[in-house]
Swiss-Prot record:
One of its GO terms (biological process) is translation. This is Large ribosomal subunit protein uL24. Signal peptide: none annotated. Belongs to the universal ribosomal protein uL24 family. One of two assembly initiator proteins, it binds directly to the 5'-end of the 23S rRNA, where it nucleates assembly of the 50S subunit. Pfam families: KOW, ribosomal_L24. It comes from Synechococcus sp. (strain CC9311). Gene3D superfamilies: 2.30.30.30. It comes from the Bacteria. PANTHER family: MITOCHONDRIAL RIBOSOMAL PROTEIN L24. One of its GO terms (cellular component) is ribonucleoprotein complex.
Length: 103
């Protein structure tokens, strides 16, 4: 998976299509990402202690990695990521559309 925590992504499919957000967490075994403020789900939580009341919690659900694309905030464009190897042997990520090196 080429996305990392802290990357800005744009949703390209689903109910939140076109929205952007920051990756909070990646789940590489499942090929999914959790994006801040997107794909919200409502969960009803029962009280766990005496005197506590139940509540309704909204939280981010995961999105499949194929439904999001890296978003360049500098160029305002979504693009695929390619991995390149520098002459010193270090690996970098680069945007296919703009050629911008991410890290």
């Amino acid at each position: 998976m080429r996305l990392r925590k802290g990357d800005t992504v744009q949703v390209i499919a689903g109910k939140d299509k076109g929205k952007t957000g920051e990756v909070l967490r990646t789940l590489p075994n499942e090929n999914r990402v959790i994006v801040e403020g997107l794909n919200m789900r409502t969960r009803h939580v029962k009280p766990t202690q005496e005197g506590e009341t139940g509540r309704i919690v909204t939280e981010e659900a995961s999105l499949h990695a194929s439904n999001v694309m890296f978003y360049s905030t500098a160029k305002k464009v979504a693009s695929r990521i390619e991995l390149i190897t520098e002459k010193d042997g270090s690996k970098k990520r680069r945007l296919k559309k703009t050629g911008e090196v991410i890290d």
